[in-house]
């Protein structure tokens, strides 16, 4: 996207203003043609051929342009249609945020590049974004032509990628590249390389032994924390089965213990990550893993677990209240009570029978 931003300025060294406008007009016509090829429903009955008019349609802020972008986003990610349907009546900014989020996940724009979706960015940048989005739709359409659903297409692509990687890593050519028979270094460099290799192996061995000791200590502390957590869990369920209401103080103490163990576990994980980043990472000869950000999934899982915990607390409170109510009713049924102004003493059940006979 940086290249597109650089091409949006006026008075460049390589192209004149007229040539820039001409290239933008051609790009607009190409994007318009791709939209027609994909049977965009918002272009039905629309007959325009003038490049300037097409550019104004695709690059000027309007509700019509926003509907075309919404259609393109739903073609890339069909489940987004349900999200848009639930957002009817809300400000347009919310839909723009959703489309910007999708564009960022597809690595087509920045996470805060909402001006691009609104149509306030330069025309060349907007057309480049639309062109890449349309290419994504076309690739999905071609890939899904032999599959009955989008998920089957993704599954088929994953299997093909795994087969390709397996073939690549099992190929003899890869092993020859990793372990060449002929040393590429000249002879006068060999003694220096051997010395550096010996020094590195010695330093690596000593560092590895230290890291193994640290890892063993961290593993031991982690096992102790896990044992404490298991003991607390067993204690909690034992108290729950006995039906002994420990009271708010006991629950608070148990909660504090769980928080303390969780905090210790968190500190151990942070220490392990610090050791790995600072010292273990230097000994590894492979790049670090490419982790995909799953923040929204973790946040949604945390919210679901919180709601489930609150629901369990409500159920426990209702169960305790119901048990107390039943116990109170049982006591009153067998207890002799004076009813009204009468001096006679009788139980609740006897009084009810007397009223029914009347």
Curated annotation (Swiss-Prot):
Region of interest called Disordered, as start-end residue ranges on this chain: 1-20
Coiled-coil positions: 203-236
Q: In which tissues is it expressed?
A: Detected in spleen, thymus, testis, ovary, small intestine and colon, with highest levels of expression in testis and ovary.
Key words of the record = Cell cycle, Cell division, Coiled coil, Cytoplasm, Cytoskeleton, Microtubule, Mitosis, Phosphoprotein
GO MF: microtubule minus-end binding; thioesterase binding
Keyword Phosphoprotein set for record: yes
Per UniProt, subcellular location reads as: Cytoplasm, Cytoskeleton, Microtubule organizing center, Centrosome; Cytoplasm, Cytoskeleton, Spindle
Under InterPro entries, the record lists: Haus7-like
Gly residues composition-biased segments: 1-10
Task: State the source organism's domain of life.
Answer: Eukaryota
Q: How does it assemble?
A: Component of the HAUS augmin-like complex. The complex interacts with the gamma-tubulin ring complex and this interaction is required for spindle assembly. Interacts with UCHL5. Interacts with EML3 (phosphorylated at 'Thr-881').
What protein family does this chain belong to?
Belongs to the HAUS7 family.
Q: What does this protein do?
A: Contributes to mitotic spindle assembly, maintenance of centrosome integrity and completion of cytokinesis as part of the HAUS augmin-like complex.
Write the protein's name.
HAUS augmin-like complex subunit 7
- Which species does this protein come from? Homo sapiens
């Amino acid at each position: 996207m940086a290249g597109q931003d650089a091409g949006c300025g006026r008075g460049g060294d390589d192209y004149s203003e007229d040539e820039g406008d001409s290239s933008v007009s051609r790009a607009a016509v190409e994007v318009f043609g791709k939209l027609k090829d994909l049977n965009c429903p918002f272009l039905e009955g629309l007959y325009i051929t003038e490049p300037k008019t097409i550019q104004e349609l695709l690059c000027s802020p309007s509700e019509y342009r926003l509907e075309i972008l919404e259609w393109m986003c739903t073609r890339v990610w069909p489940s987004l249609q349900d999200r848009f349907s639930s957002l009817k009546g809300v400000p347009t900014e919310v839909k723009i945020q959703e489309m910007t989020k999708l564009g960022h996940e597809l690595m087509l724009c920045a996470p805060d590049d909402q001006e691009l979706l609104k149509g306030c960015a330069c025309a060349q940048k907007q057309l480049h974004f639309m062109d890449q989005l349309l290419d994504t739709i076309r690739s999905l359409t071609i890939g899904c032509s032999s599959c009955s659903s989008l998920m089957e297409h993704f599954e088929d692509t994953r299997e093909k990628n795994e087969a390709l990687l397996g073939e690549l890593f099992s190929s003899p050519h890869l092993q020859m590249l990793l372990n060449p028979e002929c040393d590429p270094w000249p002879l006068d460099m060999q003694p220096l390389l051997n010395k550096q290799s010996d020094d590195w192996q010695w330093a690596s061995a000593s560092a590895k032994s230290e890291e193994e000791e640290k890892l063993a200590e961290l593993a031991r502390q982690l096992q102790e924390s896990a044992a404490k957590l298991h003991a607390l869990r067993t204690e909690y369920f034992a108290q729950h089965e006995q039906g002994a209401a420990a009271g708010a103080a006991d629950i608070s103490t148990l909660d504090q213990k769980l928080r303390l163990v969780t905090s210790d576990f968190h500190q151990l994980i942070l220490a392990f990550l610090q050791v790995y980043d600072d010292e273990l990472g230097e000994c590894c000869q492979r790049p670090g893993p490419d982790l995909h950000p799953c923040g929204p999934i973790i946040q949604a899982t945390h919210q679901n677990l919180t709601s489930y915990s609150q629901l369990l607390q409500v159920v426990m409170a209702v169960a305790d209240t119901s048990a107390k109510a039943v116990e109170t009713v049982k006591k009153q049924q067998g207890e002799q009570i004076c009813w009204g102004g009468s001096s006679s003493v009788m139980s609740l059940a006897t009084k009810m029978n007397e009223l029914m006979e009347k």
